[in-house]
Amino acid sequence: MTVKFINAKEAASMIPDGSTVAIDAFISFCLADDILGEIESRFVREGHPSSLSVVNVAGIGGDGKDRGINHFAHKGLMRRFLCSNLSLANKIYPLITEDAFPCFMIPQGVLSHMMRAIASGKPGIITEVGMKTFVDPRIDGGCINDAAKACDERPVQLIQLNGSDCLFYPAFSIDIAIIKGSKADKKGNISLEKEAMHLEQLEMATAARNSGGIVMVQ
């Protein structure tokens, strides 16, 4: 494992176009906002990184103005957005309604377990969670806008297991994981001792590493 100590601007420069980027936070708690801000600045300046497939487990709207996922409110920056809610993502709403990219919502618990599934190399999550809700493929399949309904990359499938209907949420690779910690040592071990919450930091980092991706920690 290669460990590098770099600044947020350098971290943003390492993200290729078309990457799948997973971001861990809960509203503004444990939010690596310096990195997200530098991603925005680089996109405004250079037009890169573009066409990112962005995943966040919980809502990361930050302050409801400029922080969190609001940094990504630029046409062309995202090509797909998978989340569990859009709490305080006020700048993102217009892009969703304008169909700037497909937006999908699936249950927060499923996305949380998905990080562990990806980390352990499982094919995905099989569960009844989401059945008979708008997440069910027989209803809306978690589609939030028309762009999502027209997209072939659906986050959930209806399957049968032992004669019963279930939902299958397929796993995916993570190219970049962005998390926040309190301290780091020279070996890359991260402490969360001053963070407000223990979220999916470990699972998301492991998922990215086992996908051959990069873990960025602010």
Regions found by a protein language model. Give the residues of each.
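Conserved alpha/beta enzyme-core scaffold
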Residues: 1-218
